[in-house]
């Protein structure tokens, strides 16, 4: 047993942080397509409650960088769309 080892504890925070970053990057990349399709369907369902729309004229894009993920949804609503009461 080395007595210096008792007083010189290793710092594990950098290794834990790196493992967490790898795990988060993996989960973001694997769950991205499922999340986008789920969000698209739920958002379209909410919009369809209030306005008639063509589901084919909806574009969904997701942009990812190191710190932020951005979901952009373009919905084309005709000028003569019937507005429904909620």
Curated annotation (Swiss-Prot):
Domain of life: Bacteria
Signal peptide: none
Gene3D superfamilies hit by this protein: Cell division topological specificity factor MinE
Cell cycle in keyword set: yes
UniProtKB keywords: Cell cycle, Cell division, Plasmid
HAMAP family, sorted: MinE
Protein's recorded name: Cell division topological specificity factor
The organism of origin for this protein: Rhizobium etli (strain ATCC 51251 / DSM 11541 / JCM 21823 / NBRC 15573 / CFN 42)
Organismal lineage: Bacteria, Pseudomonadati, Pseudomonadota, Alphaproteobacteria, Hyphomicrobiales
Protein's gene: minE
């Amino acid at each position: 047993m080395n007595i210096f080892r008792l007083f010189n504890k290793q710092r594990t925070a950098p290794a834990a942080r790196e493992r967490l970053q790898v795990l988060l990057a993996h989960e973001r990349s694997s769950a991205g397509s499922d999340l986008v399709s789920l969000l698209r369907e739920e958002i379209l369902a909410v919009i369809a409650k209030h306005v008639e729309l063509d589901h084919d004229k909806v574009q969904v894009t997701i942009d990812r960088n190191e710190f932020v993920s951005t979901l952009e949804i373009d919905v084309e609503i005709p000028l003569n769309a019937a507005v429904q009461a909620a």
